[in-house]
Amino acid sequence: YIRHNAKEKGIADFYIAQRVGSILEEPNQRGLAHFLEHMAFNGSKNFKNTPSSPSIVHWCEAHGIKFGTNLNAYTSVDETVYNVSSVPVKHESTIDSTLLILHDWSHYLDLDDKEIDKERGVIHEEWRTRRAGMASQRLMEEALPIVYRGTKYEDCLPIGKMEIVDNF
């Protein structure tokens, strides 16, 4: 969708929402949808993270788009959403490159073994901080198997199982 926004002239937000999430994982894949979302920032067809081809994160930060704030994504039970927000759109090339990022996210991720191994630690830290600092996360881990007993929803938290994240 394209929607006019008169409040912030010269700025645009870009999203790609996919109807895929942890509910589509098999039990031996718990956490892989979320892991793939993380890998979207570690290299793609057109953003390689090499001296001649900056990574998505480096390209965005060079254009004033902050990783984690204006460049982010999330995976839920039934969707994965990527966004690049507050993009300065004075130049057509910036719009083109941002659309190329969305294109790469939907089709052309690089899944380099070294990057995968590095990302395992990032996922572990996210899991640890959510469990340590968020009672709601621990409550969901306890409640979902009871509330959704007998359905696919009883065991499909997007963060997944760390033993699967470690060993796929």
What positions do the PLM features span?
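M16/insulysin-pitrilysin zinc metalloprotease superfamily fold
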Residues: 43-46, 84-119
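Exposed, low-complexity coil/turn segments of extracytoplasmic
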Residues: 35, 92, 125-127
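Mature N-terminal segment immediately following signal peptide/propeptide cleavage
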Residues: 1-13
